[in-house]
Amino acid sequence: MSPAPPPVTVSVDPDLTARDVRALLEAHLADMRAVSPPESVHALDLDELRDPAITFCVARTADGTLLGVGALKELDDPTEPGGHGEVKSMRTAPTAVRTGVASQLLAHLLDLARSRGLARVSLETGAEPFFAPARRFYARHGFVECGPFADYAPDPNSVFMTRPVAGSAAAPAAPPA
């Protein structure tokens, strides 16, 4: 049985200056670079996460302990009526794996997408075995495989996934893979 999820507050962190946030993102990038060829690493660094189209969020306990991070990037996608977002930089702190924190972060990102009227949220993750838990996690949360979106190109090291944003004004069916 998994431990009960800790009491968590998920909030927007616009400056990305906290040492623990930087360390978790650096570990995330190091893992991505260790398991994927350079041309297939699509994780964003700190500077890229400061893009105005990106809303970066943190999950913390009441005492301020960092449990995870994630971001929502609003895409300029004229083919998606109602708007399109991308989940980026989802990472759970090692001490919070399998506690429900990732689900809480993802729910917060989907709520942000809904509040902004986005119809669809997509993501890119790896095809390597290292990423199998991530693919299962996203599938449990309603994501299905799709083709490349936004600026992505077909890549044998990438898996693209998408889902409609429930409750948005326009939430069409998933595009074909």
Spans of features found by a protein language model:
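Acetyl-CoA-dependent GNAT
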Residues: 5-88, 93, 106-108, 112, ...
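Active-site acidic-Proline motif in GNAT/NAT acetyltransferases
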Residues: 93-95, 99
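Conserved GNAT acetyl-CoA-binding A-motif
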Residues: 113-126
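Internal catalytic or translocation cores that form aromatic/hydrophobic pockets or channels
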Residues: 144-148, 155-157
